[in-house]
Curated annotation (Swiss-Prot):
Belongs to the IspF family. This is 2-C-methyl-D-erythritol 2,4-cyclodiphosphate synthase, chloroplastic. GO terms for molecular function: 2-C-methyl-D-erythritol 2,4-cyclodiphosphate synthase activity; metal ion binding. One of its GO terms (biological process) is isopentenyl diphosphate biosynthetic process, methylerythritol 4-phosphate pathway. Its main location: plastid. It is an enzyme of class 4 (lyase). Pathway: Isoprenoid biosynthesis; isopentenyl diphosphate biosynthesis via DXP pathway; isopentenyl diphosphate from 1-deoxy-D-xylulose 5-phosphate: step 4/6. The gene is ISPF. The record marks H108, T207 as: Transition state stabilizer. Enzyme of the plastid non-mevalonate pathway for isoprenoid biosynthesis that converts 4-diphosphocytidyl-2C-methyl-D-erythritol 2-phosphate into 2C-methyl-D-erythritol 2,4-cyclodiphosphate and CMP. Is essential for chloroplast development. Its cofactor is a divalent metal cation. Disruption phenotype: Albino phenotype and seedling lethal when homozygous. The phenotype is caused by an early arrest in chloroplast differentiation.
Amino acid sequence: MATSSTQLLLSSSSLFHSQITKKPFLLPATKIGVWRPKKSLSLSCRPSASVSAASSAVDVNESVTSEKPTKTLPFRIGHGFDLHRLEPGYPLIIGGIVIPHDRGCEAHSDGDVLLHCVVDAILGALGLPDIGQIFPDSDPKWKGAASSVFIKEAVRLMDEAGYEIGNLDATLILQRPKISPHKETIRSNLSKLLGADPSVVNLKAKTHEKVDSLGENRSIAAHTVILLMKK
């Protein structure tokens, strides 16, 4: 009985082996395809609406300059920079004070480099257009204008937006003349123009070690950093 069972198993094994050799055992055929979207995808990115260059340009007018910052923050920081060429025949005015010198700033207005960069610092903190856009040199009404006019407008915009000066730090860069004898007068006048306590207005002066136009007494520059606080 055992021999008969063994023969049956061997016979079955041989039959199975011959079937594999002659005709491989295959799984039911299944179609495997690559997924493709019904519609072709475009790799180009198209905005929902076309925006022309003109629409992104800032149209500087009263409605723009009087607009309050869209986001109310407890503090706002601004930076201003300005540079003017020094030429004979012009007065040198810094912070609204006439400084004795053999040359002054060649500019469309009175060329007060300090007040100009302070204005830009305030406007920058408020997120508004710069001084050149609000008071363009292409407008004849600003020719020879006192820069105190620009400061007053910047202060008005700051007040309208609900901010006041936390502190201001300015640096003058010029080779000549020496600013130290005039520094306190300039700082005091700047504080008055800003309506700020003198303790929050700081002024420094640096030479340019006789390097480039600043060091050669051919130009004057100024930097200002300002912190505005919500009233």
